[in-house]
């Protein structure tokens, strides 16, 4: 005789949680809108306006994720109940085992959709930029900044985001002084936004012949790509624009050109640079887009009274505003805000950040 109570209770709980999400995620409104968008995309002249068609396609994907998943949860519960009934009637252990496996898989689908509730911010669904700056500490800090660049690139690639190094500045001996990475894909900003702050590395330095422990700092600053229809008022008189020859430790990630652009916004001290293209005109346009996005994020953080490190606060790259500590000799990486630890330091440096990201998002940082 099979013990059916646990699996039937689990299915009841899945139904209840899915029903809560129905309300929270506006299922009925989204289902109706999905029908409208799908009809519009079937019109023969929709591609006469390519930008609108692309926006509709993106909207449809986002709507389908919610609508189709809730339908999958509801039909999945019915199907699994049918399997349990069949297993009991036929005294079939294999069918009952299959039902338990499918119930576990359905629970994971539900968890993934529940996690979307974390992405309720206005810009969470957007593409994202990530700036990394080395702190004081010379070569050791610059090497640490490059390690962070590699870590965040690996994370993005593992999650299916298109990553592009827009700008990178070589360190004096090794590593990098700073870089800007762009992540293209849904919820890139939502996933990364809690990473803004100072990252502290403690290790025996490979650049110190006596093998002493060194502490280094580097800062990360995350900001969303913003729509062109968001008005950001920038006075051209407030800008200092420099051109320079691109250099970088980005390897295949970055073009070597004579057309790199750096823009400094004098009132805030915000600095952006772009060397991704061989065209100075395109680099300038990208840099202006970066500047608008960065000023938008700085204003949002100011409005939220956020004490995170901002671009005009590089002196804060030290003990005060740390978010995570990477102590390699003790094999311990700890998030100082959530208390989450991971002792597999190599995996984290290879981009395994989800444990930290999920904890910080769930805690509402």
UniProtKB/Swiss-Prot annotation:
Positions where N5-methylglutamine occurs in the chain: 252
Listed GO CC annotations: cytoplasm
GO molecular function ontology, one term from the record: translation release factor activity, codon specific
PROSITE patterns, sorted: RF_PROK_I
Compartment(s) of residence: Cytoplasm
Record key words, sorted: Cytoplasm, Methylation, Protein biosynthesis
Keyword Cytoplasm: yes
Major location category of this protein: cytoplasm
Protein name according to UniProt: Peptide chain release factor 2
Organism field: Colwellia psychrerythraea (strain 34H / ATCC BAA-681) (Vibrio psychroerythus)
This protein's encoding gene: prfB
